[in-house]
């Protein structure tokens, strides 16, 4: 109906005039939570983190999870869900500000890829290996993680930020 709040894959905008085909994919947003809460919980980054970690990663209490791009929208949600599930969380991000913020969010260990050797730090922090890797980056960070991955570990490939510039072939 006119004035309904709907969600769908239509891009970020305040208004949308749907085609007949669009109407099939739009969903009315239920009026059960405040709009900011709904956007946070059910936005694409939240859905990606939730189902990627819980359905593919299947985290168990005590497992070690490494999250690259940990200060990004999806990565930060993954870190927090993993903590709720009782995991030891190692977050990888770039810069003091992002790394400090991750510590405030409860991430157990943080690696600043801009100012440290990721492979060396991972070896120190993941003494019993890595059970889950939520990969938002790819490239050299993925390679560092693979050397420490445990048997029966789960790797969730979510993004490949390291290849976004197009300067190198993946």
Regions found by a protein language model. Name each.
Residues 2-69:
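NAD(P)H dinucleotide-binding glycine-rich loop of Rossmann-like/cofactor-binding domains
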Residues 140-170:
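Glycine-rich phosphate-binding loop and adjacent beta-alpha segment
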Residues 5, 64, 88, 153-155, ...:
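Short glycine-centered segments of the SAM/dcSAM-binding site in methyltransferase folds
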Residues 7, 66, 111, 131-134:
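N-terminal Rossmann-like NAD(P) cofactor-binding module of classical short-chain dehydrogenase/reductase
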Residues 42-116:
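Mid-domain Rossmann-like dinucleotide-binding core that forms the NAD(H)/NADP(H) cofactor-binding site
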């Amino acid at each position: 109906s006119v004035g309904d709040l709907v969600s769908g894959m239509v891009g970020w905008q305040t208004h949308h005039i749907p085609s007949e085909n669009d109407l099939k994919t739009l969903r009315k947003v239920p009026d059960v939570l405040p709009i900011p809460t709904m956007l946070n919980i059910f936005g694409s980054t939240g859905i990606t983190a939730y189902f990627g970690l819980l359905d593919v990663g299947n985290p168990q209490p005590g497992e070690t999870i490494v999250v690259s791009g940990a200060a990004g929208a999806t990565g930060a949600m993954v870190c927090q869900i993993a903590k709720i599930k009782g995991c030891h969380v190692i977050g990888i991000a770039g810069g003091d500000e992002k790394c400090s913020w991750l510590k405030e969010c409860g991430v157990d260990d943080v690696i600043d890829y801009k100012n440290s050797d990721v492979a060396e730090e991972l070896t120190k922090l993941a003494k019993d290996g890595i059970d889950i890797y939520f990969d938002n980056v790819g490239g050299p960070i993925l390679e560092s993680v693979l050397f420490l991955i445990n048997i029966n570990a789960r790797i969730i490939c979510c993004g490949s930020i390291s290849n976004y510039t197009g300067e190198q072939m993946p």
